[in-house]
Amino acid sequence: KSIQSALEKAKPTHLLHLGALQTPDCRDYPIRGLDVNVLGTAYLFKACLEMELPLERFVFASSSAVNGPRALYGEEGVRPEDPLQPFNLYGYWKIAGEGMAQAYHQESTVPTVSLRLATTYGPGRDRGFTAALTSALKAVASGERFEIPYRGKENYHFSHDVGAGFARAVIDPFIGYGVYNLPGQTCTVDEFLALIHEEAEDMGLDGFEIPYAE
């Protein structure tokens, strides 16, 4: 009912679905994660169908978590058509969301997009397992210590670019249903940390420590 009330009040023509619990919460509270990420998404699509909203676009925020470890893929990186091999509940539930998005389009004909994000850093990225590099940036600014909990290579998005990417997914001309990876920049965690240290030195910042967790 709360979803229907919100839709009745807003009467949206374009809908961007960002609501979800992130990876750590899905791991620690799996039933709650299922309720929010899967059932919440299902209720939203159900309400959109039953209320016959005048929607011109529906965009579902998906994730690169639907894919497996980067080592499973080639040098060209992960493509939207590559096999889905998630390694946690969050990833499986994003697959469920993409399936619901496609089913919604097939029943409603509303142009629908599933947009997959990778690792986001910057303002507003305060939670989630891959928020570590945002926390590292804060440690630099405050002169504190922060331990990086993982290594490897990631595809990174600055948070402002994520907002712009979603805006384009909502308003750019599009018909049908599609799944897309939001473009980003790929580098290792070591390379990202080296850039942080370089910029901090140029700004005269010191007193911080960013080691890897043992």
Which positions does each model-derived feature cover?
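A conserved pocket-lining segment of Rossmann-fold NAD(P)-dependent short-chain dehydrogenase/reductase
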Residues: C26-R27, P83, T112-P123, S135-H157, ...
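Active-site helix of classical SDR
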Residues: L89, W93-A96
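Glycine/proline-rich active-site loop of Rossmann-fold NAD(P)-dependent oxidoreductases
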Residues: I95, S108, Y121-T134, E144, ...
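C-terminal substrate-binding subdomain of Rossmann-fold SDR/epimerase-dehydratase oxidoreductases
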Residues: E144, I148-G152, Y156-E214
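Conserved Rossmann-fold NAD(P)-dependent oxidoreductase catalytic core, especially the SDR/UDP-sugar
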Residues: H17, A42-L89
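Conserved beta-loop-beta element that borders a ligand/cofactor-binding pocket
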Residues: R57, S62-S63, E98-P123
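NAD(P)H-binding glycine-rich loop region in Rossmannoid oxidoreductase-like domains
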Residues: S2-V36
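Flexible, glycine-rich beta-alpha linker
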Residues: N67-G68, N88-L89, V113-A131
